[in-house]
Structures are given as C-alpha cells and as structure tokens.
Swiss-Prot record:
Name used for this protein in its record: Probable septum site-determining protein MinC
NCBIfam families: minC
The protein's assembly and partners: Interacts with MinD and FtsZ.
Function noted in UniProt: Cell division inhibitor that blocks the formation of polar Z ring septums. Rapidly oscillates between the poles of the cell to destabilize FtsZ filaments that have formed before they mature into polar Z rings. Prevents FtsZ polymerization.
GO biological process terms, semicolon-separated: cell morphogenesis; division septum assembly; regulation of cell division; regulation of cell septum assembly
Keywords: Cell cycle, Cell division, Septation
Length: 270
C-alpha cells in the first residue's frame, strides 16, 4: 500500500466539540415531559445540533433504552452521535449501536454529584492506536470518561492568543477561539461565538455566547448590550425562556459563575 499523500482525502487524528445530554433519570415519561416543556417554546433553538447522550449520572442498577432517548432527541431536532458512559455501563450502553465516546469535561458527572445544567460541552473519543478519526479540530488530549473525577484544574498559565473579530456576525455564522475572544461588531440573532477563555463583545449580543467551553469555570462574558438567545459558561447556560431582569437587559454587563450559577452583573463604565 502506497503511503503517498492522497489529493482526494485525508484521515487525521483530531477532536470536535459537541453537547452532552446528561440523563439523570431512568423514567422515560418524566424525561420526555421535561424535554417537551423545555423546548416547545423554542423549537428552533437547538435545531440540528449534535449531542452525546451521557448516562454517567444514572445509578449502578439503572438502565435506559438509548434508542428511545435518541428518538426523543430527534423529536426536538437534536441528533445523537454517541454515548458517554462509565466502564461498567459500556456493555448495555453499546447495545443501541451508537459509538462509545469519551468526555473531556473536567468535572465528570456522577449520580452523586451536585445538580448541573442538562447540556454541557463534550467531545468524541480520541482514536485508538493505529486508527484515525474523521474529525479535524485540534484540541487538548481527551480525559478518560471512566476515570475518577479530578479536582478542578488550576487556571492555565499560558493560554492561546486572543482572537479579535472586527466585523458584525450575521445569523448562521460561528466563531471559535482557543483562548479569549474579542468581538467589535454586533452578534446577530442566530450567530454564535464560542471561546475556551473569556468573551468580550463591544456591541449588542443578540445571538449565542459560550465561554469556557472546555470546563473553564473562571471564564467570563463581557458585553456592552445584553440581548442574547443564550449565554453559557463551562456548560452552565441560560436561554431566552428565562427572561433577563430589567437592570441587565440591553445593558453593559459581565457574566460569571458563582457556585455553579450564572451571575449577571451590570458594568459601571462611567
């Protein structure tokens, strides 16, 4: 077999960000009712987003039919691409035909962990030796989903360079920054800005802003006019179905995490 580089395709080791859909109950009726309640008011919000079904929060004796959960997600236009499970769950989790994935979230969910938001950032598993993945977005080495939860990692001393975007972002556009992200134009409805570090928006934010996407709980979002579809830090998010109070809506604000809750505070610029 020739090792000459093909002009038609490449196979490279890599990673890709997606969302975790964390299953916290084996009661499918309750799960279905909550999905409908959460998304019926905003059916287009997560439309066509891909997710990994995370079953690590289930008790040892609990099992869920993953085909049924995949169908529920399809009903709200989310596409399941795999399953994140503890090693002892692999036998039944693999029965649905979805690939087993590894997660890179620093605080691996467990049935005994404190309650978290049901959607977090996740990643597909790194390829085994001798194999290659079809994803091509470079990222840090993935954490083993089966390993015990680690203590929160200290802040990284040397982050990637700040990315500056000096143009407006229209609906459907997405920007991803490995470090901090600075946006000098409006982020329109339907646009999305994502950063592993902080996000600074010196214009109206009307789309989605996700900071600290790889589990950086110290990340913050700053903007001069807050009118968002969604704001998120380290996977903990808030959407338009939870209206913002008048003292921050349309105002200059900073957004940070405090004890796993999003804190939205006015910025005093004068």
């Amino acid at each position: 077999m020739s090792l000459k580089k093909s002009p038609f395709f490449e196979l490279r080791s890599g990673s890709v960000d997606t969302l975790l859909f964390i299953v916290k109950t084996a009661d499918l009726d309750a799960l279905r009712a909550e999905l409908v309640k959460r998304f019926e008011a905003t059916p287009e919000f997560f439309a066509d987003d891909v997710v990994a079904i995370d079953v690590r929060r289930l008790a040892d004796h609990e099992r869920v039919p993953l085909d049924d959960i995949r169908g529920m997600l399809n009903d709200v236009r989310m596409r399941a691409i795999g399953v994140v499970a503890q090693p002892e769950q692999h036998a039944w989790a693999a029965s649905a035909g979805l690939p087993l994935l590894e997660a890179r979230d620093r605080r691996a969910p467990s049935s005994k962990a404190a309650d978290e938001a049901p959607v977090q950032q996740a990643e597909p598993a790194a390829p085994a030796a001798g194999q290659a993945a079809l994803f091509e977005q470079a990222g840090p080495t993935l954490a083993d989903a089966g390993a015990p939860p680690e203590s929160p990692a200290p802040a990284v001393a040397a982050q990637s360079a700040t990315l500056v975007v000096d143009r407006p972002l229209r609906s459907g556009q997405q920007i991803y920054a490995k470090g901090d992200l600075v946006v000098l134009g409006p982020v329109s409805y339907g646009a999305e800005v994502i950063a592993e570090g902080n996000i600074h928006i010196y214009a109206p934010l009307r789309g989605r802003a996700l900071a600290g996407v790889h589990g950086n709980h110290d990340a913050r979002i700053f903007c001069t006019c807050l009118e968002p579809e969604l704001i998120s830090i380290a996977g903990i998010y808030r959407t338009t179905e939870n209206p913002l109070p008048a003292d921050v809506l349309g105002k200059s604000v900073q957004i940070r995490l405090e004890q796993e809750k999003l804190m939205i505070e006015p910025l005093r610029l004068t």
